[in-house]
UniProtKB/Swiss-Prot annotation:
Residues 264-315 form the SOCS box domain. The SOCS box domain mediates the interaction with the Elongin BC complex, an adapter module in different E3 ubiquitin ligase complexes. Pfam families: SPRY (PF00622). Residues 32-59, 328-354 are annotated as: Disordered. Keywords: Nucleus, Ubl conjugation pathway. Substrate-recognition component of the ECS(SPSB3) complex, composed of SPSB3, CUL5, ELOB, ELOC and RNF7/RBX2. Interacts with MET. It is found in: Nucleus. Substrate-recognition component of a cullin-5-RING E3 ubiquitin-protein ligase complex (ECS complex, also named CRL5 complex), which mediates the ubiquitination and subsequent proteasomal degradation of target proteins, such as CGAS and SNAI1. The ECS(SPSB3) complex catalyzes 'Lys-48'-linked ubiquitination of nuclear CGAS in cycling cells, leading to its degradation. Recognizes and binds nucleosome-bound CGAS: ubiquitination and degradation of nuclear CGAS during G1 and G2 phases is required to promote low intranuclear CGAS abundance before the next mitotic cycle. Gene3D superfamilies: 2.60.120.920. Its main location: nucleus. This is SPRY domain-containing SOCS box protein 3. It comes from Mus musculus.
Amino acid sequence: MARRTRSSRAWHFVLSAARRDTDARAVALAGSSNWGYDSDGQHSDSDSDPEYSSLPPSIPSAVPVTGESFCDCEGQNEATFCNSLHTAHRGKDCRCGEEDEDFDWVWDDLNKSSATLLSCDNRKVSFHMEYSCGTAAIRGTKELGDGQHFWEIKMTSPVYGTDMMVGIGTSDVDLDKYHHTFCSLLGRDEDSWGLSYTGLLHHKGDKTSFSSRFGQGSIIGVHLDTWHGTLTFFKNRKCIGVAATRLQNRRFYPMVCSTAAKSSMKVIRSCASSTSLQYLCCYRLRQLRPNSGDTLEGLPLPPGLKQVLHNKLGWVLSMNCNHWKSPVPPPGTATPGAESLETRPCQRKRCRRS
């Protein structure tokens, strides 16, 4: 394919967007020698920076990420350009990992971008149903206050484009601000944090290498611990790491955003718990038995109690937390309610000696 100037390529795709499928644009971009531009000719700030040093080289933004699925279901780990991307994920839906039936929150039909559509009891959000001309976003129905909050987002479509992100934000985030701009919406300001499918973590307009890429079929877990003030991400139910600290006394909404045409994400788990002794015990049990399929197996507990713990705190008991440690806030910065678990016994002992 002959090389086009930046402006001519941009006009070509803008004028033909309504007539051509997304994969046709992907093929056109794949044949071009200038990578990193979306179909509108705007630069993809997520794909332009060097990737995490241990990861493969950056791929063109129009090519979906493959090989990162939670399961091995057909079609989750491969992408072809002979058919449209819409057709690629229109077949039999994968339900792997979708065991939960009760949800603490779903997507909010009243707080979303115009280029979104909800389905599956408002648990699945589809972005840019025909073609994309910017960035669409949505938030959950519940403001996350005190306690422990955990949710999982499953990528139910090919993952590609300038950005597809999972994260959190305050009520000050304008979800429709960039509906005509291709960008990484979550993390552009101090009111939000976003994990990009490219593996970059965004906050205050800055981005850092945080994880490997994720693609269709990937399950991204998010744990907001308002007791320690931490935000932790999981990929395919394995801990990636702590993304933010000192989040005590703040309230957030779960959020996602996408620039990709015909893309979609689904809430497959959303739960909350108070920071109770019951939670702390389950948390510690999981740390002591990180590789156990059933954390409570073999423990001398009544069957009824085991069932209650599984129902209320199953997400704690099932997570891979080999590297899941809540950081201790620096001295003088933590609030009284956010003291580390490790320092409290020492403080009580000192009081007894005095």
